[in-house]
Amino acid sequence: MGFLTKKERRVPDLSRYDYHYQNKPAVDSSKYYVPREYGGKRLSASAAAAAIYTNPNPNATGVSRSYSLMHSYNPAAARQPPAGRTYSLRSDRASSITSNSRRPAAGKAQVRRASTQQRRASVDQELGTGVNQPRTNSITVTTTKVRDPQGRTKSITKKTVRRINGYEVVETTTTTTTTEPLPTQNGKMPANMDLVSVEDGTDVEEEHDDGLPSPQAHFDEFSGDFVAEDDLSSEVLQHQQQQYIEDIVEEETEEEEDPGHTGTKRLPGEFNEPPRTNIAARRSNSLTGSLSSLGAKKTISEEVPLDQTSSVSKFSDAMEYIPPTTTTAKPKKSNLRNSMTARKLAQPQQGQNQRRTVSFTQGSIDHMNTTKKKKQPLTEQEMYLQALEVAKKKVYKTDDPAVVGNAANNSNKRVSTMGKRMTLRDSAPVPRSSSMMMNKFHDQGSARNNVAQQQTDVRRSKSMTGSAVPPQAGKKKLTDEEMYEKALEIAQKRYNDLVSADTAAVGAASVGAASAATPVASTAPKKSGFKQRFTKTFHTDDNKSKINNASAGGMVSGGAAAVEVAPGVTTTDPVVAENVNEASQIERMDNVEMASASAANEYAAPAAGFRATSAPLYQSRSAEPVGAYAAPDAPISKYKIVDKILKFAQSNYGYQAHDDEEAAMVAPASAPATAPAGTSMAQPVVVPVERRSSVGKHGNTTTLPVETPLADNASESSFRHTHPQEQPVPLSQIEKKISVVSETGSRKAAPAATAAKTPATAPAMSYGTAKTPFIDIDAVDALSGHVPFEEATRHASVATAATAATGGTTGTAATTGTGTSKKKSFLRKLFGRK
């Protein structure tokens, strides 16, 4: 059973050393291990062969390839039964290695087996063989890497063994990386290279007494190039190297072709070396001469270039001459292999040195030319001329005729200035101006460019005209006195212009006012401000008498209104005239209102203790009489919405007059107020305020004054509740005069009665068809001046209730009349009387 079979010990595969015994037929097989598969004499069969299914490494310098097709030495092995189904290294070839474990010494080389990969696949179906055939159809692939003591990979060997019907096809691919040992600084070869000199000029490798190569020689074989042993391969390699050198020489010849630098001098860091074509010959002669005598010493007296001794010292400038060195040779046999290697090393080094020297010389030519010139100091005159020329080019660009001429002459000479150092002595290249480029566009006939140029010219001309800046060349530096005088002159001029303009305006207005005989309709255009546009839609015209807005000064004959701004001063400015007319119109409206109020005061009987006066509520701003503008009863045809809202707000806000207006309103104490005939002075009746008790949430009892409900206290406007105001005077201390409208429409005054005192019977009151009281709010405001709208309405309701008690109207009718009067008085206050 296969599971109970004991697993044999695996033996390492030593086939990676097969290429070492290639082309060595004289080696005794008794001293070296020869695999039984190769018959002991076919050592070159596994040397170096290319793989069929794998591509060689393109970076490898040498690839050896050999193909071998060998018949099995034991044909009867194909008829043996299979030795288990485990795919391991237990093959006939591997088990035979156990009889002899001797291996050649590897010296100092550290050989490491990187990876071993075995792949065995049955090809019975492909070849049409039987199933019970032994495991002879298989493929084995082995990959081995060899590294040196420094850890660098020296070679990679891939061996593929294909067993088909008793035949073995061995394919071995060896990829080697040639690393030549670097020479020391004193020119000696490395210690591991045991080179000797003989009469024929060739050197051989050292052998031990027992006829076996030394471990060092064995290691050198791993380090060397295995392709060099083949004559055909060596010829191909030499041809490739020669072609590479010729390519380098051709490149260097093209780089050296510079007519401007043919006679350059040698740099300080450059060495005196012979022509480059003799480098290889001199190197071979020196190497042959040094090894010509057996055991003799020869001193190298020639001057050796630094680049040939060491590749590291090409950047070292410490020594320009290398001292002579001494070499010792040992009498040994010769070998063609090492001589070929030495000859091969000289040729690539020659091309490498040539390329390095040429690049160094080519890169330093410009630096030598620049350092060869010596700077000479400029005189003051030369420095001034150069500075002046540069300044002209910066300021005037190409406007200077001389510069333009030079640019025209040099336009066809396109000389490259890259890499040249600019000095003040050299003539600077003239840049192409914008005018030249625009001329070129004009010649091409581009319409778009022409339009762009015209727009640019127009903008430039506008900027030059608007700024009017004098040229900088004509400016002078002003002293402090001159600057002060100029500033004073400018200030005086501005002041005189302003004064003359004002005087001319006033004089023209005076002349126009004097020459105007009759007022003429104004035809001058008037500025339509925000007020005019806003109030035009609210003008009402009811075909009644209108107030003339024209000023007393009349109109100018030219068409502009002459408005009197101050006593004896008029103006024709439409804006000023408009403002003056508006102010005068508002003043006339106030006078008319005050006249109406004074008329109401004359008919009303003042209450006891009230400051009654026949003067208007507001003192007139003008000294002219009221009758000069309008009659007391003449209604106003035009009301401005702003004035209406302001007046309505003041009436509901409880407007308080200023001190001067208060003094004008108070009548002198010596002039007692008199009432018209047929009326009597009513005495004020003090009625205590009713109070009601309320219980708080903590059980305490509080007494609050019984006032009207909140619905009665609500104002028609929001001004009263949103702004602080003074408390109005109680109605119990004021005797109101309420004007009522009779059926005939005449105004009569009746004293207001209180709940405690029954007034005299009032005549029948009617407004329209319903017999309801009509409250004149203007009369109430004229009498009190600060009594709110709600208080007057409440007092009117009390008077209506008293009238109803005497037989006039019922309480229900009085209440209805009060609500109706509120709405009508609000509309009448907002849009004027009707």
UniProtKB/Swiss-Prot annotation:
Residues 343-368 have a biased composition (Polar residues). Keywords: Cell membrane, DNA recombination, Meiosis, Membrane. The keyword Membrane applies. Its main location: membrane. It is found in: Cell membrane. One of its GO terms (biological process) is meiotic cell cycle. May be involved in the control of meiotic sister-chromatid recombination. This is Meiotic sister-chromatid recombination protein 3.
